[in-house]
Amino acid sequence: MHRSWILGMAFAGVAAASGCGGDYILTVPDQVAPAGGETVTVVRLQRNDFFVLAPAVEEAAMRFRIGDGPLRAAYTDNLGYAAAAVSVPEKPGRHTMTVAHLDMQGDEAERDCDVYVWDPSRPVVAVDMDCLPGLWLGSSEDAAKALRHLVVGANLLYLTRQSVRHHRAAHETLTKAGYPVGPILTWQREHWHIVRDGPYKLPRVVVEGRLVSQLPEVRKVFPHLATGVCDSALAAKAFAEAGLSVVMVGKAAADVSTELRRRESWSDLAAQGP
């Protein structure tokens, strides 16, 4: 069975009514998984008790479900993290996962996240979202056209250095600017691994504070992730270190160990392709 790894940490906002202990903050990331496989979903539950402070909620029961699929559950650890392996549908497409918690006082935190189910034999293109025009300044017309051409026969994922709390709004901005749909991942995420302990050797996810690149793990699940599109030397270096060929838009200097193809502009990329 294939397994996908946590992809990004999209801030999900306050997800419950106010109670005596404050509001819940439930963080649920975008998910990407191979069709018919499973996604190991890592979420975090906090409580907004002291204005900007948000202490972790420990030993909270979390429920995970995609549509009418099997229900999975896990308890949060001392950092507020909980993880569960959730089976995804056989049919590729964008599905919805619901993550929820109900406490003893009747306060509930619930969030939906997008689950992108992909055919692992299909090509995947990665794009540095931070270089796209139209999200902050400039016109998105040429860049959006170029990316729409890229996703003909391929899947697309976005990578960003932005704070995770902006990912949900970024999805809306991308859509309004005419860019194709795809999961938003942070360039790096917390490192985590699975251990088996206790008398029954049940699997448990341990989340560590150190950050690691997402791309190598994504490539293990989707081996046809082969191309990265960007306009900066830093992003080009990250793509090359993960073994991707680089398509550089513009004239920024770049020294990479993999194939480098240059396009003078987004309109040039739209006309020539990658």
Tell where the protein language model's regions lie, with residue ranges.
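Bacterial N-terminal signal peptides that target proteins for export
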Residues: 1-7
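Bacterial N-terminal signal peptides
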Residues: 8-16
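Beta-strand-enriched, solvent-exposed domains that form extended recognition/catalytic surfaces
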Residues: 20-120
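Asp-based phosphoryl-transfer active-site loop
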Residues: 123-138, 239
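Structural beta-sheet core signal
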Residues: 127, 158-160, 228, 248
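Second-shell loop/turn segments in exported
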Residues: 132-137, 158-161, 200-204
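Short, acidic loop-to-helix structural element flanking the phosphoryl-transfer center
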Residues: 135-157, 164-171, 209
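C-terminal cap/substrate-recognition subdomain and adjoining C-terminal extension
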Residues: 166-274
